Amino acid sequence: MSKISVVYWSQSGNTAAMAEAVAKGVTDAGKEAEIVFVSSASIDELKSETAFALGCPAMGVEVLEEGEMEPFVTELEGCVAGKTIGLFGSYGWGDGEWMRDWVDRMTVAGATVVGGEGVICQDAPDDDAKTACEELGKKLAAV
């Protein structure tokens, strides 16, 4: 059975809850999901996967978390060409600029972002956001 990694960073638990929902979608579609906090994630493992998910909330002035997730994404940019990636995350304020920027970065690096956009929600994911995350997982599993 092929595996789909769901790599995320979360401070409040909101993006972690979204990661759980993405993984549920993957397993509901018949594939194995591995949820990994970014500090334990391996770029080499992601290189061997056709599809994977990345999650991070908006931080500061709508940017990725700068201590762990941003350096990970920067390193990953060099090896995402030809990969299918699902992006997700929560925010407290703003309009989703951090996600649009992230989608653009991955697209320019040669990845296909599922649906052409990330799944976002304000604060804790409600039922609609959880459903959207599950659908993201199912789409990744279909790759």
For each predicted feature, which ranges?
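Helix-turn-helix
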Residues: 41
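FMN-binding flavodoxin-like domain, especially the glycine-rich phosphate-binding loop
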Residues: 3-4, 14-17, 21-38, 48-143
